[in-house]
Curated annotation (Swiss-Prot):
Cofactors: heme b
Function recorded in the entry: Component of the ubiquinol-cytochrome c reductase complex (complex III or cytochrome b-c1 complex) that is part of the mitochondrial respiratory chain. The b-c1 complex mediates electron transfer from ubiquinol to cytochrome c. Contributes to the generation of a proton gradient across the mitochondrial membrane that is then used for ATP synthesis.
InterPro entries in alphabetical order: Cyt_b/b6_C, Cyt_b/b6_C_sf, Cyt_b/b6_N, Cytb/b6-like_sf, Cytochrome_b, Cytochrome_b_C_euk/bac, Cytochrome_b_N_euk/bac, Di-haem_cyt_TM
Main location group: mitochondrion
Location relative to the cell: Mitochondrion inner membrane
Primary gene name: MT-CYB
Coiled coil ranges: none
Keyword Metal-binding: yes
The organism of origin for this protein: Xanthonycticebus pygmaeus
Source superkingdom: Eukaryota
Pfam families: Cytochrom_B_C, Cytochrome_B
Entry's Gene Ontology molecular function annotations: metal ion binding; ubiquinol-cytochrome-c reductase activity
Name of the protein: Cytochrome b
């Protein structure tokens, strides 16, 4: 009798991706975050779909439609807060996933890494547009400030901003198109995830040692399927605790005030997962320079494979590079903290120092340290 799992055209794809997939025998829990990101994406699409059934993308009714979801729709409050806090979990997993790729040298899988950078940009765009939809004060002013950054582009800047707005300010047209893009982008992200996995399965996963594991592979199921299941339990437990006990912990109180173009909030700031980039943007006094630094803070990830000068792939056996990696992590946490603070001293100088150190670490210190470690190998 033929095995349907191995012969059926559709089942064969699933089998090669999630069941009989040859996996390195030594991958740690840091490799769990890929599957957790898939779980987060599923949660976001399902909850988002139910929210879209009740939401209205009109400036006069958007805020009250979100209030209606929370008050009148069956379990609407839990759907809304799962979606809002699910985004935070999504970014937490994303940052750890990228960090693991940097630490263990997964960026040497060029195609997979580049699609990953595109995915990060797509998820950030989706999250930004989603934050605008409740049409609270922070939604409106966040949209105004961030879209206005494009006016820094020479010659075409202002035309571009008004084209995105669909008028002369953030208004009904802006909200409608942001809702349309926020709805369609997760499906584009899903397609990119599939491409990401196709490229990954061409080469096979990396492992903590950074050396080839072709001689020692084990099937994905049952070993890593159960390991991923444990990670999913931890993720869902954390998300449930967040949603049920303190759903507004990561949100901004200003967003419970309906959008008012005549009153500017005292501190305009994005959600916590954008604060590091926002701090880099604010640390440069020049508008165009700030926008370029903001773009580079993410796009620099695409340069990392070309800045890799070490003979070893992973930093597991490179203590100096390990120190630099954790300096980078501490630096990003500092930038996240600074992004949420008002623009005054000493926060300005701390933000500027951390921004310089961020680019200096990635562009100069890490490649030079790797070259020095190559010399040490010969001693």
């Amino acid at each position: 009798m033929t095995n349907i799992r191995k012969n059926h055209p559709l089942m064969k794809i699933i089998n090669h991706s999630f069941i009989d997939l040859p996996s390195p025998s030594n991958i740690s829990s840091w490799w769990n975050f890929g599957s957790l990101l898939g779980l987060c994406l599923m949660i976001q699409i399902i909850t988002g779909l139910f929210l879209a059934m009740h939401y209205t993308s009109d400036t006069t009714t958007a805020f009250s439609s979100v209030a209606h979801i929370c008050r009148d729709v069956n379990y609407g409050w839990i759907i809304r807060y799962l979606h809002a806090n699910g985004a935070s979990m999504f970014f937490l997993c994303l940052f750890i996933h990228v960090g693991r790729g940097l630490y263990y040298g997964s960026f040497t899988l060029l195609d997979t890494w580049n699609i990953g950078v595109m995915l990060l940009l797509a998820v950030m765009a989706t999250a930004f547009m989603g934050y605008v939809l409740p049409w609270g004060q922070m939604s409106f002013w966040g949209a105004t400030v961030i879209t206005n950054l494009l006016s820094a582009i020479p010659y075409i800047g202002m035309n571009l901003v008004e084209w995105i707005w669909g008028g002369f300010s953030v208004d009904k047209a802006t909200l409608t198109r942001f809702f349309a893009f926020h709805f369609i982008l997760p499906f584009i992200i899903t397609a990119l995830v599939m491409i990401h996995l196709i490229f990954l399965h061409e080469t096979g996963s990396n492992n903590p040692s950074g050396i080839s594991s072709d001689s020692d592979k084990i099937p994905f199921h049952p070993y890593y399927s159960f390991k991923d299941l444990l990670g999913a339990v931890f993720l869902l437990t954390t998300l449930s605790v967040l949603v049920l006990f303190s759903p507004d912990l990561l949100g901004d109180p200003d967003n419970y005030t309906p959008a008012n173009p005549l009153i500017t909030p005292p501190h305009i700031k994005p959600e916590w997962y954008f604060l590091f980039a926002y701090a880099i943007l604010r640390s440069i006094p020049n508008k165009l320079g700030g926008v370029m630094a903001l773009a580079m803070s993410i796009l620099i990830l695409a340069l990392i494979p070309h800045l890799h000068t070490a003979k070893q792939r992973s930093v597991m056996f490179r203590p100096l590079s390990q120190c630099l990696f954790w300096v980078l992590v501490a630096n990003l946490l500092t930038l996240t903290w600074i992004g949420g603070q008002p623009v005054e001293n000493p926060f300005i100088i701390i933000g500027q120092t951390a921004s310089i150190l961020y680019f200096l670490t990635i562009l100069v210190l890490m490649p030079l340290t790797s070259l020095f470690e190559n010399k040490l190998l010969k001693w």
